[in-house]
Structures are given as C-alpha cells and as structure tokens.
Amino acid sequence: MKSLLPTTGLALLLALSLTPAQGEEVTLEHQGLTLNANLETTGANWPQGPVVLMTHGTLAHGGMETLQGLQSALKDRGISSLSMTLSLGLDNRHGMYECATPHSHQHTDAVAEIGAWLGWLQGQGTAKVALLGYSRGGNQSARFAVEHPEVPVNAVILIAPQTWNEADAEQDYRQRYGKELAPHSQL
C-alpha cells in the first residue's frame, strides 16, 4: 500500500497540471441580456495585447473543451484570450444550449455580440485583437469582419468554419435522397 501512495500522488499532481487554464468570468450587458465570457490573461499588462476573441460553434459555449485548450495554448505562448458564450437569446447562459429549449435566436445575432465584446476589449485598453471562430463561430466571426470593416481587427482565424448555402443544401438533399427538401406536414 505504501508504494502506491507516491505513485497516486504523482499521478494526481500530473493530472492537475494538465487541466485547462481557468480564467476569470467577465460579464457585460447587451440588449437586455447579460453576456459572459472567460478571460484568460498573461499578466497585469494583458490589454497591451495581443488578445484573441473566441467564438464557439452551434449551441456550444465559451467554456467548451476545445476553446479551453486553445486558451491554455495561447496563454503558454504569451497571448491573452477572451472566450465568449453567445447568449442565443438567453440571459447569462452557461453550458450547452438545451435542444429541447425553443430556438428564437438568429444566426446573425452573434455579429452584434461579437461587436459588444470587441467594444468591451477596447474599453479595457486593448488595441491588438484577433477574432477566432470555431465551426459556426468561424462563420460568424468572418461575417463580423466583412460587415464591420471600420472595427480594427488585426487578424481573423477560422477553424473548421461552418459554411452553408440554401440552394446547395437543397441540391445535396435531392441528390442523396432522390426527392425535394420540403416541410413534412404529417407526423
């Protein structure tokens, strides 16, 4: 039993050292909703930049494992990051969006929230910002950059960006299933 104690202690210390970085939760009010994000800084002078503003994929959240890992890797390289959780129409949303919850948000709602977080970063004194979007967040980050060229963004990083075109989706469905994509009126 004695020989297991040092091994168990070493394994526990190793596991704790591999845990993704846990930054500070920050919030802001936007269009009647509280938005939240995870701020991972590299020290007291973090606003001097660069800072990466991260947007997650469909129905996910800013604390998802992929983004936590990216925040940790960025911090290891001396880069601060802010991983936002899109509200998806819910106040102070945390965690995955429940599929059973009625969806009233629009794909384009994220553009305004990205702008709100960029405004927050500018208010902190940040001048060097890169947008990073993962999956659907990649599409939304690219959309923000195109629709708001007046906002200073130093880089746009897209990881597996979601792309979608209604006509292409309908054609793909027709080819796959041999029928038109249309609402089903009978359940």
Language-model-detected regions and their locations in the chain:
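Bacterial N-terminal signal peptides
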Residues: T8-S17
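Cap/lid segment of the alpha/beta-hydrolase catalytic domain
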Residues: S87-H105
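Alpha/beta-hydrolase active-site loop
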Residues: T101-G123
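The alpha/beta-hydrolase serine catalytic core
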Residues: L35, P102-H105, P152-L187
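N-terminal cap/lid segment of alpha/beta-hydrolase-fold proteins
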Residues: A21-A44
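Short, surface-exposed "cap/lid" segments of acyl-processing enzymes
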Residues: W46-P47, V52-R77, S81-L86
